[in-house]
Design a protein with these regions (language model features):
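DEDD superfamily 3′-5′ metal-dependent exonuclease/proofreading module
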Residues: 10, 15-739
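Cationic, low-complexity basic patches in intrinsically disordered or flexible, solvent-exposed regions
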Residues: 6
């Protein structure tokens, strides 16, 4: 076997030589080959490879998340469009077994010129499927397709100075290098009398291009086959429609990466051999070691190298999760600490933000908050002169003091600890809230950005604002869900109408406008830029409105409108913390339960069914009002997001998949219960076929329940409404406590 010779010539360790000799003598009964997916997992973490290899033994939170990720980014459509632009002769995606796919690839390779999708190659114990392979004589173009945006005028695959492969695309480029390594090896082994030249490309969404075709999303619809596998079904006239555009305006481009791939394979890129990247091995050494470990189903003998990325490990089970699967994350950490420590101590994992050096702490064997000193966290982002509340440095120490129960640390915060585990700066809030102008306006946006532009003139990953919700709070304390918008025509560009509707909602008075985080400010500034280059008759009026409620930079100078939106998230960071509910996280999905469980006033008020009647709603009828407060068996307020209508069957996702839709949150129900779910739901509305939508089981030919689109729109409206109502809950909590 060629691999054995390679191992002898290149591996320094005797153990590796014996391993490969052993692999030749004992072939496993059920053959398992080292694939692109396995290689990608090993790059992320070599110790994960064993867990990935044994899916029936180990819990994996990402096990079924490919569909959601690809749907959210438009990956399915990019792949199909790439095949059309490349003029693929034959697609081998339906040949599932190793031997059959390799056999058919070899048959097609006999042609002088051919373009193959999912071309299969095996070399020793390694196997790859190439997204698109073009053969012209003895010249082969190996094209990997990714739903990532790229600007070749600015972005670089590799630093010219250090030769380090850019971290943002490193996994992609290494993926292509691995494919080239296997394909070249397979070709040399099978066609020893021929000399093939393999050239590598990454085909990605081109940020320098604007679509010259409207409705690309209508050309590609997603269905699931009888085995549950997702597939793209193209419109009958897809080629005809695409041919209406000009080749120079194609929004996906094959960027050459052959030079950097050659350097990777030769072990000459700057990241190799240091900083624990690939176990400090060179590329070929690492690939062969990982291939052996994977195919022989054996672990690395060394203890895992821990880092801050371990905190987001998909092989970590949730506390209290009961099933028969093992916890790979725990197995790794138990090599370095005790089970008692993992159960009882507060990990540094929940410390987030700037000024932290978690990798350094971990390398020094400090995994828990009670092991940190003041020297470990740098002071950063100090308060502005005269500004009240916590800065981010102080907030970190507040969290540490509450998590660890350290009385000495708590001393500096004790005058603002209003109940066990709850910090509230009443005086700071009172000072801040005195500057607000009534009526108050709470707004929240839902947006999407995918690789293939929906509309003519758009760039890849350009933002589309498809929904907003608006609650109003009057000076007498009355509350109303005053307005909302959801794009009802997914074939029309919604951004400008979105701003028109928002303007109508907010121009009735001069009251303060609130957002949660910076997203709304960024989106409105993005739409202002889109308006600048548009032909809309009212564009000047709309831009002027946007400038009144946002801030933006121009030539390094920040300009803020007279009603520049107030960020409620920043107020939470400065004035409020509930350790039991938040644990270092500040998303509105974490803060809402923290506020509700901290307030007897809110518990009493919203345990009554007043929402929809006393508090008017755009979506809850007055004769069917609801109560937002429901207590669980532990007398704990359940998250109101869990009360939303069940639409998991509409999305076609599992409970575990729902958990993954929003990073750092754990909404585990079948509801549109976070921003990631809303984005996924809207993209499903755009991309999934009527047959796929119906296949979820939500509707039948004689069904009396709402259609898929109607049910999904209702869920989106309810979700966004709760986002702005959550902001109202936070305001009410603050208002009640400053009386």
């Amino acid at each position: 076997m060629v691999l054995l010779k390679f191992g002898i010539n290149n591996f320094a360790g005797q153990e590796i030589f014996v391993i490969f000799a052993f692999n030749l003598l004992f072939k496993p009964m059920t053959e398992k080959l080292f694939t692109k997916s396995a290689f990608k997992v090993s790059l992320d973490c070599p110790w994960k490879l064993y867990y990935y290899r044994n899916p029936n033994l180990y819990f994996n939170a990402n096990a079924e998340n490919d569909f959601l990720e690809s749907l959210a980014q438009g990956g399915f459509q990019v792949g199909e469009l790439a095949k059309i632009y490349s003029h693929v002769d034959e697609d081998l995606k339906d040949i599932m077994d190793y031997d059959g796919s390799v056999r058919r690839t070899n048959e097609l390779m006999k042609r002088e010129n051919v373009c193959i999708a999912e071309a299969a190659f095996r070399w020793g114990n390694m196997f790859v499927r190439v997204d698109i392979l073009k053969k012209v004589g003895n010249h082969i173009s190996l094209i990997e397709v990714k739903a990532k945006s790229w600007d070749d005028t600015k972005d670089k695959f590799c630093s010219e100075k250090t030769r380090v492969v850019s971290s943002g695309v490193r996994s992609y480029v290494y993926d292509v290098a691995f494919q080239k390594y296997v394909v070249e090896g397979a070709l040399k082994e099978q066609y020893s009398d021929q000399c093939f030249k393999v050239e590598a490309f990454l085909m990605m969404a081109d940020k320098t291009k604007r679509a010259d075709i409207n409705g690309l999303n209508k050309l590609f619809k997603i269905e699931k086959d009888k085995n549950g596998r997702s597939k793209v079904v193209t419109a009958p006239d897809v080629v005809e429609v695409l041919n209406q555009g000009k080749p120079e305006n194609h929004v996906i481009t094959a960027f050459p990466v052959d030079g950097v791939c050659n350097a990777i394979i030769a072990g000459k890129t700057g990241e190799q051999g240091k900083d624990d990247w690939m176990l400090n091995l060179k590329f070929t050494e690492y690939v062969q070691l990982m291939a052996y470990k994977y195919c022989s189903n054996s672990r690395l003998s060394s203890a895992p190298l821990l880092s801050k990325t371990c905190f987001d490990c998909e092989y970590r089970k949730a506390k209290g999760q009961e099933d028969n699967l093992l916890d790979g994350w725990r197995e790794c950490w138990l090599k370095h600490t005790t089970n008692s420590n993992l159960e009882k101590l507060s990990p540094i994992a929940s410390l987030n933000g700037s000024g932290l050096n978690r990798d350094k702490w971990i390398k020094n064997g400090r995994y828990f908050m009670d092991e940190l000193t003041y020297d470990d966290i740098k002071e950063y982002d100090p308060r502005k002169a005269g500004e009240s509340g916590l800065d981010l440095y102080e907030r970190k120490w507040l969290q540490i003091s509450l998590e660890t129960g350290n009385e000495e640390l708590l001393e500096r915060f004790k005058d603002k600890i209003v109940s066990p585990g709850v910090y509230l700066d009443v005086e700071g809030l009172k000072e801040e809230m005195a500057t607000w102008k009534y009526p108050l306006h709470m707004i929240d946006f839902e947006t999407t950005a995918v690789a293939l532009p929906f509309y003519e003139g758009m760039k890849p990953y350009e933002q589309v604002a498809f929904q907003f919700s608006h609650h109003i709070i009057r000076e007498d304390g009355s509350i109303e869900h005053a307005g909302q918008y959801l794009n009802e025509d997914v074939n029309e560009f919604p951004n400008f109408e979105f701003v028109r509707r928002l303007k109508v909602q907010l121009e009735q008075d001069k009251g303060s406008v609130f957002r949660y985080a910076n997203h709304e400010n960024s989106i409105l500034n993005c739409i202002a830029e889109q308006l600048e280059s548009s032909k809309e008759k009212d564009k000047d009026e709309l831009i002027e409105f946007i400038r009144t409620i946002t801030h933006h930079k121009d030539n390094g100078v920040t300009y803020a409108g007279e009603r520049d939106m107030i960020d409620l998230l920043e107020l939470v960071k400065r004035f409020f913390y509930n350790v039991d509910e938040m644990h270092g996280r500040n998303s509105i999905k974490q803060v809402l339960p923290a506020v509700l469980n901290s307030s007897e006033y809110l518990k009493e008020k919203y345990a009554k069914p007043i929402y929809g009647s006393v508090i008017k709603s755009q979506n809850i009828p007055a004769d069917k009002p609801i109560a937002w407060i429901h207590m669980d068996e532990q007398d704990h307020v359940e998250s109101p997001y869990h009360l939303l209508d069940n639409i998991g069957n509409l999305l076609g996702v599992t409970e575990e998949e729902m958990k993954q839709m929003e990073m750092n949150d754990s909404d585990a129900d079948f509801q549109v219960a976070n921003g990631g779910a809303a984005l996924t739901a809207y993209n499903k509305l755009l991309f999934c076929s009527d047959e796929e939508n119906a296949s979820t089981g939500a509707i039948t030919e004689k069904s009396t329940v709402p259609s898929f689109s109607e049910a999904l729109r209702t869920a989106l409206l309810r979700y966004c409404e709760l986002d702005t109502m959550s902001m109202v809950f936070i305001w009410e909590y603050f208002k009640d406590n400053i009386k």
